[in-house]
Amino acid sequence: LMGFGTTMNLLDGVDGLAGSLTLLSLFFLGGFLYGIIGHTDVARYLLLPHRPDGARWGILIFVAAGGLGGYVWHNAKPSAVLMGDAGSRFLGLLVGMAVLASGNPFMVLVVSPVVLLNGGTGLVKLLLLRFFGRLGFDVRPPARNIVNAQAHNAATEEEEARQAFFVRFLHRYRFPLHDHCRKKLNWSDPQVLVRFMLVQALLTPLLMGLLVKLR
């Protein structure tokens, strides 16, 4: 729960992004809890364990999604309402609790693939850089990526050229991923929002189908 809350917090850099992706996650989770594992006949047909409290959890999730929809309406760029760190972490907690209620922790990979890809890859990069740093590799970021390079002890172009290729590869990408899309690919905030939502809206049904039918 703490890890997913942190990952969700990393989404809070584009107006409406965290709320919109969470809204998609809640709709799919609510449908799964209420209409699949909360329904005796459907769960039996799909050979899934029936959870008697699944329907109650589904209703709770749909109610939370309705409230979140009102927030997203006012959080569209330019945002009139901000959630801050406390709000984004609460969204992560809400999705995490619903995933645990489903009885399958791996459901988080199904309902929030873009959320995990956006923030999780940044955590992986950080861990890898710390690991390589402990092994003695120069893992300083390149000076071209930092405004005040000396204050951040960044690597010059000559020092960057001497760094290991995997360190240079890691520094080539900015994280969270939405920041890379904005700074490196020159996507606007609305482009990031729509494209991230589209990817999650396409991936989640596909992964859900693999989970319930082809597992």
Where are each of the predicted segments found?
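Alpha-helical transmembrane segments
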Residues: 2-4, 16-215
